[in-house]
Every structure is written in structure tokens, then in C-alpha cells.
A protein has these predicted regions:
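Structural preference for solvent-exposed beta-strand-turn elements
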Residues: 1-241
């Protein structure tokens, strides 16, 4: 049986998604190669996530908004994308307490309203452009970069020698020399994002010295190393580092 969830970087089970929906009252059938979900009458409840999964938190939030009563989500992910989704649901008329923390309280069951909403800039895309700058050198101005949500990324970039100046709506960055060696570890927000690990691996491959990068989220995220080695990079991978 093959279910959604998973890709070349590692296992991405959907068990937490299904558990949250079941606890809210959804009827879920898993048969053959398909999952059928019926959600006629969702009821608010207490949800406890064993891992701060971004996707499971998002699904729980949206289902809780439609459920009657109060839902408390313990162990919620704290990524900026969760906060943005909460603000979007708030704009539609859902009351949510604890935004930005690991306990979210959703007062659901109200009729949702039409709304116009602006999605902020993507922190991973911004980090990718900055990583490209560190390899190529030169100067870069990123308009619309979500600087408030990039502390972990900017710390790593500065450690490697990138000069970054922050403004309310942009980042000005300059790279004058080859990157310096770095020592970083991935983790849930606000730590360094796993989605930028392969970018920093490319940066480390041209750095002046030995870097150490630890991956704590996805077990196959270092597959990039093999491709960089084909291009001449000196990389060894041992036990997630």
C-alpha cells in the first residue's frame, strides 16, 4: 500500500495529519491505495502533536476553524508560515489565541468571510538567493524579504562572511571574498531551516576551510553531497553530519 507522504529527502509520514482529523471527529478510511475522509460534523477538542509538524499543524488549524467549539493544539509548529495562516484565518473571522507559540487555541464554528490577504515574502527563497550570492560574490538587494523570520539563516550567513544590512522591507547583502568555514545544525524554527541545508552545503564546498553541517530533520537530505562530489567538492558524510 502506498500513501501520500515522502520524497527523496526522507520519510514524511502523514500519521499526525490523520490523527488530528480523527480526534476532531472526521471519519477516515484507509483502504488499498486511497484515503477517504468524511467530515460532516467536526467538534473542537484538545490535540497533542508528538512532533511540531508544519503540515499537521496547518491541517489541524484549518479543520479546527470549521469545527464547532474550542480546539487546543499542543506542540504546534512555530514556523512563520503557521503564523501567516493564523492571521489569514483571523481575517476570515476565526479567533485564534497564542499565535506564535506552541499552544494554539482556535475558537471555531463561525461562518467564514471573504477576505483579501497579502502573502509575505518566502524566507527560503530569500535564503536561496543569498546563498547564490555567497558562491558567486558581489552585491544583492532583496526586496520584500521577511527579515523578522530569518534570524537563524542570517546568523549562519554572517558566520560564513556575508555582510548583511537589514531594512524593514529589504536585505542588502555583499560578499567580497570566499566564504568562511561554518558550523551549523538544522532544526525546527527558529533554528536554521532544513530547506536551506543543501544551499549551505554548496556554499561550504567553496569555503576557505573545513565546515561541519548537521542535519536533524530529514535522513536523506545529504543526497546533494554526492552530486557536489561529482563536481569536485571534498565532502564526507557520517551519521547525519
Amino acid at each position: 500500500t502506498c500513501y501520500p507522504g515522502g520524497c527523496v529527502i526522507g520519510r514524511r509520514p502523514i500519521d499526525l495529519h490523520l490523527l488530528a482529523l480523527r480526534q476532531l471527529g472526521a471519519d477516515i478510511d484507509c483502504e488499498c491505495e486511497q484515503i477517504t475522509v468524511r467530515a460532516d460534523k467536526l467538534q473542537g477538542t484538545d490535540l497533542r502533536l508528538s512532533f511540531p509538524s508544519v503540515g499537521a499543524t496547518e491541517n489541524a488549524l484549518m479543520a479546527a476553524a470549521a469545527a464547532k467549539g474550542v480546539t487546543r493544539i499542543y506542540g504546534a509548529a512555530r514556523e512563520p508560515e503557521i503564523e501567516v495562516l493564523c492571521r489569514f484565518l483571523e481575517a476570515m473571522g476565526v479567533r485564534i489565541d497564542g499565535i506564535g507559540g506552541s499552544l494554539l487555541t482556535v475558537h471555531g464554528g463561525e461562518r467564514l468571510q471573504d477576505v483579501e490577504f497579502r502573502v509575505p515574502g518566502d524566507r527560503i527563497v530569500a535564503g536561496t538567493y543569498l546563498g547564490a550570492l555567497m558562491v558567486a560574490g558581489g552585491e544583492l538587494c532583496l526586496l520584500g524579504a521577511p527579515t523578522d523570520h530569518m534570524a537563524g539563516t542570517l546568523t549562519a550567513l554572517r558566520q560564513a562572511g556575508c555582510l548583511c544590512k537589514l531594512y524593514p522591507d529589504r536585505i542588502y547583502a555583499r560578499m567580497k571574498e570566499r566564504p568562511q568555514p561554518m558550523d551549523l545544525s538544522t532544526g525546527p524554527y527558529p533554528e536554521f531551516p532544513t530547506d536551506l541545508q543543501s544551499v549551505m552545503l554548496a556554499v561550504a564546498s567553496v569555503a576557505q576551510g573545513r565546515s561541519r553541517i548537521r542535519e536533524t530533520v530529514f535522513e536523506e537530505r545529504f543526497a546533494t553531497a554526492g552530486e557536489l562530489k561529482k563536481m569536485g567538492a571534498d565532502i564526507s558524510v557520517e551519521e547525519g553530519t
